[in-house]
Amino acid sequence: MTLLTRRALASIVLLAIAGFAQPVRLTPQPQKSRTFYALADPQVPPSLREPPAALPIGDTTAMASASDGAIWYGTAQGLVRVDGKADPRDRCQYFAGHRYLPDDGVQQLVPDLSSGMWVRTRTGVSHIELRSMTLEDKTEIFENRIRQRHDRHGLVAPSNLVTAGDPATNQTRDDDNDGLWTSMYAAAECFRYAVTKSPEALARARRSTEAVLFLEEVAGKRGFPARSYIGKGEPLPRDGQWHWTPDGRYYWKGDTSSDEIVGHLFLYGVAADLLPDQALKKRIAETTTRIVDHILDHGYYLIDVTGKPTTWGRWSQDYFRQNPPDSPLNSLELLSFLKTAAHITGNQRYEKEYRNVAIELGYAQIATRYLDIRGEINYSDEELAMLAFYGLFRYEKDEDRLNRFYRPALDAWWANIVREHSPLWMCIYATGEPRAKLNFDTAARTLYRMPIDTIDWTVKNSHRQDVVFDQEVDRFEHRQAKTLLPRDELPVAKWNSNPFVVDGGNDGRSEDDGAAFLLPYWMGRYHKFLLGK
């Protein structure tokens, strides 16, 4: 009996005894912010300028009790807050690196009157505040940041900071996965509109959905989306395969990955279902038709302008005969493309091809083999799988097919994903396994602990005594932990990153867009896994 078969049987037993997913009622929670000051700044408490008092032990350099009763400890390697009354997951919190401190050498602490702390270090002062806010309040911070610094022709992606750590020096740039990141942001805005009916959400959803649609149009409207593009006069990129449009107005990037097709089709299904604009829905259906026809007409390959398949756009039986470890994922992707296209367009060609691919060609069975042939854990593949699962579980109504193939396949991926406490993957898992016993308090806790500051500061945790390391490195040879640290103590990351790599960052030379927070929040609100604001 294979491991996957055992997982499937265990899942059946679990579902027989489990209740439904447990939604969580959201409440305002303290969110961290910090402001740096020079020691001589008049806003700094005068007592912080006094010589620090010596403590009887060497490891602790300062100690203070905050107005809420929490005890803060300064050390030569950062700051620790201990609150015995807090949820066990939040009882001990670590502050280090430029996300929180001018440097990690804490010398003196002075509490403010609102549960926060003034912190003097070797090189400056940080005022760390704990501001009570709802998750919806938090979304507004991310939304404003995206509008101000991460919108390039409607595409949403990370940006560079010319001066490290200074958002005023922000420069948007093209990204290999502009289509995927923008699709995830646009989908978040679609869910936001469905929940709130906000005109602003509708406008943002339209703008970014149109930007994703244009990626296919700029490359010639032949069903081959560009990875990214720039306009004439913008700085020319130095990497990848780029092509000018015939009119010389745009320069677009080729060698498009399966990542982009997954992202586009995920968005198109969500937008077609949730947005009211009939003209936009027509464009979505036409673009979906061209993309899926391109894949079908080229034998399940994505064919570049070179006439050859792209590096990762391969879903054919010939490719699968080589027994690549990504065949379960790629099978899942193609099935999701076809099912989503059938739903969006109503074209029976795609439904007929879907059934042929699923059963006659055996792709549904191949999709269940993930644990049998997985060579390594690839967190980018997890992202692609879960986005593909969303379309399948949303549009597939055949319970036999769901129970025989797709739910066992989902459980195989979930075996590792469950460790990550990702609210996005929890939402998608719950749509596929509605009887599974999931507590969305875990999802909410991750959202609460995602940092508001998305600058890619250098973060180091490998020295910590509370981190237990795995003996195996990850696929990039990075040391990884068994301990899952809170997101606001980790390097800034998207959902395709390994959350068990505890060191990282680039000294504040870039800023993430923050859409990784918006999509699970609004998806959770839409599906009523997250109740309230």
For every predicted segment, state its role.
Residues D137-P167, R204-K221, E286-V305, R349-Y370, ...:
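Long, well-ordered core segments of solenoidal/helical folds
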Residues A76-V80, T123-S126:
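Loop/turn residues immediately N-terminal
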Residues A70-Y73, G116-V119:
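Conserved beta-propeller blade signature
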Residues D83-P88, R131:
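Short loop/turn segments that connect beta-strands within beta-propeller blades
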